[in-house]
Swiss-Prot record:
The keyword Protein biosynthesis does not apply. The lineage of its organism: Eukaryota, Metazoa, Chordata, Craniata, Vertebrata. Glycans are attached at N2, N32. Its main location: membrane. PANTHER family: G-PROTEIN COUPLED RECEPTOR (PTHR22750). It comes from Mus musculus. Belongs to the G-protein coupled receptor 1 family. This is Sphingosine 1-phosphate receptor 4. Receptor for the lysosphingolipid sphingosine 1-phosphate (S1P). S1P is a bioactive lysophospholipid that elicits diverse physiological effect on most types of cells and tissues. May be involved in cell migration processes that are specific for lymphocytes. SUPFAM superfamilies: Family A G protein-coupled receptor-like (SSF81321).
Length: 386
């Protein structure tokens, strides 16, 4: 008896028994009902991934390595403990976990999907949802703190630090709740009419809820940066000095980069999920062929975030260069003078004494490289935070 014939003979009572026992046949049943099983084209194709499995894992590993490098560089070589420092660490950590969750999701996809218990399936998908949510919540928190820094009166460092810690903890708590909601009961197990075609055990109501949450986050981020830009532009018009106008242009470029990155990376995924929610199963199956690319594009946003939020800061650039320099020294790939000279030359335009690295003769002593706090950590913040 094939899967299609067997699934038609399954009664609601037997389906609930499969769910209670945590049997993997429940996943097969849901995939067959959604049409995902018929569209996989056999088990030898890797469950729709096929030749994309290798590049997908490689892309996820690159996201992990990129964010791990930035995370280590900021944590080791930057002495600043202002609020932006914690925001950058939070964004980088969430993007690193997004890359890890994506790699785990790809490795457990394909034929391995039907070897998972329902709980493991919910954890596989929920971990990726949680990581993506943490990344977007972190971007929203950073935008909110930038705006609050500009409009609030000066406050004590202890008060600001406590609020930053609390908001970071809230970001991760909300992300964990959002990712675990299906495991906690918001799912469509044995309720096939309410099931998503793209994520066969997820309720369409939950998918719609996630789309609305992510869309509201995007609108809030763009609104906050738009307000920040208006404040900076107004200050620049009051001040005829060229640095103020350059700061306004730099902020505008950053806001445009954030907008383009969000629309390009998240727009296709939003469209796919909306088609799944409001379209028919046949319509959803037509878009299903591009699901792997669309999900990879959303994860790619975690590779772009360091370029927007971290590498645009000269202080972070110096930290990353110092981290790479010490790695070269440890591997013996180039002499300390050559390595450190390149870093010094990269920032020699600021000041002859602005070099934040001191040449050392060994890898051990190179770890004590120090940075001068000559400029704000964030290139798009108009005032120093206390």
């Amino acid at each position: 008896m094939n899967i299609s014939t067997w699934s038609t003979l399954v009664t609601p009572e037997s389906c609930h028994r499969l769910a209670a026992s945590g049997h993997s046949l429940l996943i097969v049943l849901h995939y067959n009902h959604s049409g995902r099983l018929a569209s996989r084209g056999g088990s030898e194709d890797g469950g729709g991934l096929g030749m994309l499995r290798g590049p997908s894992v490689a892309a996820g590993c690159l996201v992990v390595l990129e964010n791990a490098m930035v995370l280590a560089a900021i944590a080791i070589y930057m002495r600043s403990r202002r609020w932006v420092y914690y925001c950058l660490l939070n964004i980088t950590l969430s993007d690193l976990l997004t890359g890890l969750a994506y790699v785990v999701n790809v490795l457990l996809s394909g034929t391995r999907t039907f070897q998972l218990s329902p709980v493991h399936w919910f954890l596989r998908e929920g971990l990726l949802f949680m990581a993506l949510a943490a990344s977007t919540f972190s971007l929203l928190f950073t935008a909110g703190e930038r705006f609050a820094t500009m409009v609030r009166v000066a406050e004590s460092g202890a008060t600001k630090t406590s609020r930053v810690y609390g908001c970071i903890g809230l970001c991760w708590l909300l992300a964990a709740i959002l990712g675990l909601l299906p495991l906690l009961g918001w799912n469509c197990v044995c309720a096939f009419p309410r099931c998503s075609s793209l994520l066969p055990l997820y309720s369409k109501g939950y998918v719609l809820f996630c789309v609305v949450v992510f869309a509201l986050i995007l609108v809030a981020i763009l609104s906050l940066y738009g307000a920040i830009f208006r404040v900076v532009r107004a200050n620049g018009q009051k001040s005829p000095r060229p640095p103020a106008r350059r700061k306004s242009r730099r902020l505008l470029n950053t806001v445009l980069m954030i907008l383009v990155a969000f629309v390009v990376c998240w727009g296709p995924l939003f469209g796919l999920l909306l088609a799944d929610i409001f379209g028919s199963n046949v319509w959803a199956q037509e878009y299903l062929r591009g699901m792997d690319w669309i999900l990879a594009l959303a994860v790619f946003n975690s590779a772009i975030n360091p370029l927007i939020y971290s590498f645009r800061s000269r202080e972070v650039q110096r930290a990353v260069l110092a981290f790479l320099c010490c790695g070269c020294l440890w591997l013996g790939l180039r002499g300390p003078g050559d390595c450190l000279t390149r870093i010094t030359e990269a920032h020699s335009g600021a000041s002859t004494t602005d070099s934040s690295l001191r040449p050392r003769d060994s890898f051990r002593t190179s770890r004590s490289l120090s940075f001068r706090m000559r400029e704000p950590l964030s290139s798009i913040s108009s005032v120093r935070s206390t």
